[in-house]
Amino acid sequence: MGNMKVYEALARQLRADSIRCSTIAGSGHPTSSLSAADLMAVLLAGHLRYDWSEPKNPANDHLIFSKGHASPLNYALFRAAGAITDQELMTFRKRGSRLEGHPTPVVPWVDVATGSLGQGLPIAVGIALAGKRVLGAPYHVWTLTGDSELAEGSIWEGLDHAGHERLANFTAIFDVNRLGQHGPTELEWNLDVYAARAKAFGCEPIVIDGHDVAAIDEALARARHADGPTVIVAKTVKGKGVSFLEDKEGWHGKALDEEQARRALAEIGDVPSRTFPTLKPDPWQPPKRPAPRMPEWKTYREPLATRKAYGEALAALGAARADVVVLDGEVSNSTHAEDFKKTAADRFFEMYIAEQQMVAAAVGMQVVGLIPFASTFAAFMTRAFDFVRMAAISRASIRLCGSHAGVSIGEDGPSQMALEDLAMMRAVHGSTVLYPCDANQTARLVGLMAEYGGISYLRTTREKTPILYTDRLEEFRVGGSRIVRGGAPDDAVAVVAAGITVHEAIKAADEVRGKIKVRVIDAYSVKPIDTVALVDAARATGGRLCVVEDHWIQGGLGDAVLAALAEAGVAREIERFVHLAVRDMPGSGKPAELLDAAGISARHIVNAVRELAGSGRGGHR
């Protein structure tokens, strides 16, 4: 048992500091911080094993504030541990401060950005999963979870997976303070229901009074030594420690003014400013991995689906690198991510039909130095978009693959067709968006993704596609493109395509060969796009451009091309621009039928090329 007086003193300091920093900021969530102060005081002073001077120590425990709005408490913890000064704490929410309104890894003791509720817990599951199955690490993963976010389905995806994997190194602490943003939460203080739900998902519930430091101490010790995942269900009071805030509605997200803060601090009592001793982890280093080597890529000669090439490239990576992990959403026999199991079965993670948890786990795994690839149908990746968005704020490096893109998937129909994914992924800050057209290109791009930081997205195709690139030494780069037809200074028309439509564009160019000189650009790097190649094509053809894509007309390749030309200052040089894209809701049919019905087949490209080649100065369509 720890020192109860130390816990109580630390809790008072955490409460006082949460109020002080938010009052000076003039905004923040002090009442949400006050409810969890006792929980975090006992964790910090008695159970968290963390070397604050070395945040990258691989043996450190991990603490994630899933209720990221309680950032005043998070930063008060850092101050109590001696990681930051009181002076820095008072810069909370100010321009240029590391202490942003919700935690981000700009602060070195923060693993991931939180603040979009329902995300911290499933990311913590990913960190725990990596620690157990890949690293064999001694760390424990703790996450502070608010009761309002327990309405999020992603929380239960996370607990389901924690239970399924028997993650004894994972503990969720439910701060059940009864009040949400504008009123009571769904279950208020019905702790039995929370406990029953946790148990149903395979986690051991521990129900406590969240303001009884002795009970908290005992619960945390029990969680540390449990043989499976634990959920501490703590009954707390929002605004605890300040009488005019306790269990009162209308205070969420409101800082106290100076007079209110003086009254509150007087109630909290004497708080000597101090740094509290904390536990350090025992020395530990992960087992040495073999040095990464160049993967042995296959060279394909016969038509092959890019989704199949993706799987075989993962297998090559798995043999060459011990830090690569692969996650899939129960469609690995379609995405072909299952091929990774041929070389690294112990680093393949079946995430089932839980796309949010899949992306969250990938974010968690990269926290501890792994290189995650996560795949599902591109249409279903949209379900995890907020996790991708937050991953960018986390400065995370994750690699996503969306298969079965566009109308070219055929008979399965529009529910399975990703027609929004390029727009979605282009919009993510700092993202890389790649769309290969053949198997050899796919393998090389997968290799690039393994080396590239940030969020990268690979769009793959269901149908087999012809092989265009057969040179074993062929190189591709992020931000590059290839001219696959034409390329002369007197080309009449340029057709820009990516993925499946590259082959339709080639058919069209071959059909008009000898009559119209067509330059076909394989824009495999949709973001960043090859602006130099586009400008050269625009000028060579007198500004006659056609973009063809298997995607809705909004937000995809066409918009990327126009934006690049506009930013390069050559938009006025465009004589005529034709954008062939999916405009009407598709149905079922053969891939070739659907490409034609959508107006993006070779036949439609031929018509566009002829129109462009014979056009005078005109507009856009």
Go through each PLM region and give its residues:
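Short beta-strand/turn micro-motifs composed of small residues
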Residues: T145-G146, F174, D328, T376, ...
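Thiamine diphosphate
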Residues: M1-W142, V207, R262, P272-R459, ...
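A short helix-loop-beta submotif of the ANL/AMP-binding
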Residues: D147, I232, I371
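Alpha-helical transition-metal enzyme core signature, strongest for iron centers
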Residues: S148, A391, C546
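Active-site glycine- and acidic-residue-rich loops that bind
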Residues: S148-I155, G210-D217, F380, P436-A443, ...
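Residue-level marker for buried hydrophobic side chains located in beta-strands
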Residues: T143-L144, A172-D175, C401, Y435, ...
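Conserved acidic functional residues
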Residues: G146-E149, Y352, D522
